Each structure stands twice: as C-alpha cells, then as structure tokens.
Amino acid sequence: LWAQWYIGLMVPPLMLALLTQEKALDVSPEHFHAEFHETGRVACFWVDVCEDKNATPHSPQQRMETLISQALVPVVQALEATGEINGKLIWSNTGYLINWYLTEMKQLLGEATVESLRHALFFEKTLTNGEDNPLWRTVVLRDGLLVRRTCCQRYRLPDVQQCGDCTLK
C-alpha cells in the first residue's frame, strides 16, 4: 500500500498543474520533498516550483509523458529494486489512478482532451519518444467502461476487503 499512498498523493496535483497551467512544472525528482506519517506512509509533499522550459510548449500528451518518465519511472524503479513489490502492480494501480483523475478533470480539460489522453496513455504501446509505455493496457474497455485490467492485490492485506470493482469478481 505504501506505493499507492505515495503515488496517489503525488499524481493528482501534478496532473492538475501540468494539464491546466500555461507553464509546465519541472517534475524532476530533485524538486520533490516528502514528510512521512508515523506509520511510514507519505503524509505530504512539497515541491520546489520551477518551470520546465522544455515542457512548457508541449501538448497535454507530452506533458503527461514527462510526468511518467521524469516523476514516476524513478519512483517505480526504486520501489521495484527493493524486491518487495512488482513494478507492474505499481503501474497497474497508477493507470487506474490516472484514469480516475482524468474523469475528475473532464470539466476542466474538456471531453476531447480527456479522451485523447486516455487513448495515448492506455492504448498506445510506446510513448512519443519511442520508450515503452508503462501504462499501456493498465485499464481496458469492458462493457463500454474503462476498468482496471488486473487486481490491485489490496484484498491480501489484513482487514482489507476486495475493491468494489475488483477484477476477481
């Protein structure tokens, strides 16, 4: 759950900044600082606000790809290197989170932008720079809805039940 707490706290505000502001926020890891809760999970972040002059002229898709490659890939690689969690599970949960937040942002961004981002993020095997897209097929179309492709595994934790939309049902 640590990875879900960390990424779940970090991604929505970064998406909001990257997709709604004229100037792109530099999302390089050195600009992020975290404070931890007594339980060990991240309690809050603060960010050194700096413009990424290279990303400022980018499209929403390219800005999201910057979020993936600069902010998320290093975190997922570090967590996977511990040997405690599989990176594919982290990406699966991250895809689900991003898809949910795109729905929340639909009024701000417009339906066309949200659908374009969903297509690029979840249905393209590679990013525009040619790298593998770690979010590819983390959510899939089922019965007309985008849903998580694989179980998040939360049900394995003590005192935690299956999610309402668990793929194991």
PLM regions: where:
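Hydrophobic, aromatic-lined core segments that form the binding pocket/scaffold
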Residues: 1-142
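Active-site-proximal "nucleotidyltransferase
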Residues: 135-145, 150-156
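Local cysteine-cluster metal-coordination motifs and their immediate loop/turn environment
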Residues: 149-169
